[in-house]
């Protein structure tokens, strides 16, 4: 029981620490990079959304040109960090966390490794657990017993997501977004319409633990 309590306290501390950073320090970092790049940040309230595929959307009373500049800046400098801090402070279950974060990590890995030519949608897993649909060399490494730790992690995530997809589909995972509202030089996290829909039943969680 003592270990459980320590872990819970540590988890709460890390969540509070990240929440504090989001509220008090994130905007200063965004502003610093924007100034370096000569990008004007909006004076009015605006919003950043990052979906599980890594697509960034900027909303607010901003010109399309300015939206594109800010989107590119966020993509190049903050996207992964913003996703990580959001998902770690969001009010979601462990199962939801593992599913949506697994999808994000698989997508980012595949897109970066293939220069955006492939995505999770291209992946197939047969009854023997063999992964196909990606470039031949990548599939060979992914299916090898000698794959490095990163490839093993991606492979396990692919198995988990494929199992979930076969049981429930991916619509609920794809609807999840990391949302940030920026107003008066303050950043705060905001929920989006899809963030409460990821299935979280005991039966699936029990099965999930046996395949990862």
Predicted features, each with a name:
Residues 1-212:
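Type III/flagellar secretion export determinants
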């Amino acid at each position: 029981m003592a270990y459980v309590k320590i872990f819970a306290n540590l988890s709460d501390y890390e969540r509070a620490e990240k929440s504090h950073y989001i509220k008090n320090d994130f905007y200063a970092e965004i502003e610093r990079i924007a100034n370096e790049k000569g990008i004007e940040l909006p004076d009015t309230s605006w919003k950043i959304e990052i979906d599980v595929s890594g697509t960034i959307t900027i909303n607010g009373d901003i010109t399309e040109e300015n939206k594109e500049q800010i989107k590119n800046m966020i993509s190049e400098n903050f996207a992964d960090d913003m996703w990580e801090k959001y998902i770690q402070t969001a009010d979601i279950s462990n199962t939801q966390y593992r599913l949506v974060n697994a999808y994000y990590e698989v997508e980012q890995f595949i897109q970066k490794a293939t220069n955006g030519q492939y995505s999770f949608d291209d992946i197939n897993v047969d009854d023997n657990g063999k992964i196909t649909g990606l470039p031949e060399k990548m599939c060979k490494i992914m299916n090898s017993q000698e794959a490095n730790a990163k490839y093993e992690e991606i492979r396990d995530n692919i198995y988990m997501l494929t199992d979930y997809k076969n049981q429930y589909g991916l619509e609920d995972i794809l609807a999840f977004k990391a949302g940030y509202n920026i107003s008066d030089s303050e950043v705060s996290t905001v929920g989006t319409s899809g963030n409460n829909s990821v299935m979280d039943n005991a039966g699936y969680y029990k099965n999930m633990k046996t395949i990862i």
